[in-house]
């Protein structure tokens, strides 16, 4: 079962959803990556929480510019802290 989202993560996801529903349709498709930066951000926040999810999202958005060719760039998997070495 997935852990519950923090209030901060919920707020950030709400802001991203607002962007997706209001601003993104006006701008048209511009993201060079798959999944899009906004979908990446939501997944990163759900998977890693507010701090690390925000950091991963910021790094992704900063890579999304005309000099980067883009392509497939999924959210990294969350490693299990209880794994055996």
From Swiss-Prot:
It is found in: Cell inner membrane. GO terms for cellular component: plasma membrane. Pfam families: YidD (PF01809). The keyword Transport does not apply. It is a peripheral membrane protein. Residues 66-85 are annotated as: Disordered. NCBIfam families: membrane protein insertion efficiency factor YidD (TIGR00278). Belongs to the UPF0161 family. Could be involved in insertion of integral membrane proteins into the membrane. PANTHER family: MEMBRANE PROTEIN INSERTION EFFICIENCY FACTOR-RELATED. This is Putative membrane protein insertion efficiency factor.
């Amino acid at each position: 079962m997935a852990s519950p989202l923090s209030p901060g993560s919920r707020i950030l996801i709400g802001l991203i959803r607002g962007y997706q529903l209001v601003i993104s349709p006006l701008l048209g498709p511009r993201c060079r990556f798959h999944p899009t930066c906004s979908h990446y951000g939501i997944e990163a926040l759900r998977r890693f929480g507010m701090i690390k999810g925000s950091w991963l999202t910021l790094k992704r958005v900063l890579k999304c510019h005309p000099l980067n060719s883009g392509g497939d760039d999924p959210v990294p998997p969350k490693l299990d802290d209880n794994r055996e070495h």
